[in-house]
Amino acid sequence: MKKDFAENLIKKIEEKSIIPNKVILEITEYILIDNSNKVYSSLKKLHDFGIKISLDDFGTGYSSLSYLRKYPIDYLKIDKSFVDETYSKNGKIFIETIVKMGQMLNMKIVAEGVENSNQVEYLKSISCDLYQGYYFSKPLSAKDFEDFYKVKNR
C-alpha cells in the first residue's frame, strides 16, 4: 500500500462528492502481511472516514485469525474453494465456522463463486449474508452492468 494511499483516496471521494459509506475497498490477505503498522493506519483512517473494508479470498494464502481481530474489516469474503465444498461434511464445517465467527465480529459475510441453487440454499440456511458468482451473473463491464441493472429493476 503506497504511503499516501488513504489520504489520496479520501481526497478523490471528497472531490467527487461520493458518500463514503457507499464505497467498499476490497483488499486481499496478502496486503496485511506487509508493513502491518502502516497498513493498519491507512485502513483505520479510511474506515474512520466511512469507507467499508472487505477482506477478499479469506481462508486461502496467508490467512491469520489475528487479521480479523486487528484490522477494521466490514466484509469477509469466503473464497470459492470453500464454497465448492458445500457438499462435504468438512467443507460445511469450515464454511459454517467462518460465517459464525465473522458475524460474531460484526462482519457481513460474502460467499464467492456461487454457481448453483444448492449452494445458494445451503448458504441461506446458515445465514450467510451475501453471495456472488456465476449463478447470478458472469463478470460484467460497467456498461453491461448498467444494462443488466436496468433490465432487473424494471
Language-model-derived ranges and their functions:
Residues 1-3, 22-36, 49-154:
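EAL-family c-di-GMP phosphodiesterase catalytic domain
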